[in-house]
Amino acid sequence: MKLNEQIPKDLLRLIKSSKYVHVATCSSNCIPSVSLMHYIFVSSAETFHKHEYSIEIDCNDYIIFTVFEKSVTFRNVMSNPNVALLFHDWITAKNLTLRKKSVHSKDDFSFVESESTKFNNFLRDLNQSELNQVSATINGIADIVNPNSEESTYYRRLLLTVNPDADIFILGEDTAIIKVNIQKIKVSDMENNTSTYGQTVQPV
């Protein structure tokens, strides 16, 4: 699915700019699992084949992330490639930022207490104007990229560029690249209005 031709610009901006995505998978015997992942959005113009001398034409956009090969998510994708991804940038990052105290400070405990109180007060006073109105759920088909391939190296490099703080998850041993082909997007707002983009497909 090529998103920029089918969904509103604000929705595309949310998918491109969110820091994390909730990834829902299900085992072959229907046991669900959810994980929070660093990810990147890769447009059809940025996919690996566009940078190689390939005659194949791929007009799809993808969500790319890494998983550990011993994880439940990896095992689930191997047995059941149908996944759901939740994007919900529910609050601006600056409102969640708490300043760190210097490690040389003598009143560490009082600092933690005051910052904790500040954060609790912030959550208590949170109002609707500080919340984004839209969340998006993507249904897609996940594919495990060969970890020894040039494609895997290419996507790891992109992931690391966008998420330099997640190098242990991107470059760690026994990790694999997961590439999700987007099939359908369902958008919901605070008033329970919903819109659907893409076509419903039969599960793999």
From Swiss-Prot:
Q: Which organism is it from?
A: Saccharomyces cerevisiae (strain ATCC 204508 / S288c)
> Gene Ontology terms, cellular component aspect?
cytoplasm; nucleus
Where is it located?
Cytoplasm; Nucleus
Name listed for the protein in its UniProt record: Pyridoxamine 5'-phosphate oxidase YLR456W homolog
| Family membership | Belongs to the pyridoxamine 5'-phosphate oxidase family.
Where does the source fall among the domains of life?
Answer: Eukaryota
Tell me which UniProt keywords the record has, alphabetically.
Cytoplasm, Flavoprotein, FMN, Nucleus
Keyword Flavoprotein among UniProt keywords: yes
In terms of SUPFAM superfamilies, this protein maps to: FMN-binding split barrel
What's the miscellaneous note?
Present with 589 molecules/cell in log phase SD medium.
